[in-house]
Amino acid sequence: MIIPWQQVDSETLDNLLEAFVLREGTDYGEHERSLTEKVADVRRQLVSGEAVLVWSELHETINIMPRGSFHAGAEEQQ
């Protein structure tokens, strides 16, 4: 189930974004990027609609996914 990011408390959203970025592992890009920059990138993706907050009832967890991946997974389950 998609959770509208606008309805999440701002401090909670900040914590979710930071946890997501930290969980994603090492960035092997040419230039090292700060945690703040990475969090800002994920926030931009949420705001633009490229990414969505997804609640898993099965696992009782929340995750951030590319919008296209969420729809593909939802179609496979139907």
From Swiss-Prot:
This is UPF0270 protein YpsIP31758_3941. Belongs to the UPF0270 family. InterPro entries: UPF0270, YehU-like_sf. HAMAP family: UPF0270. Coiled coil: none annotated.
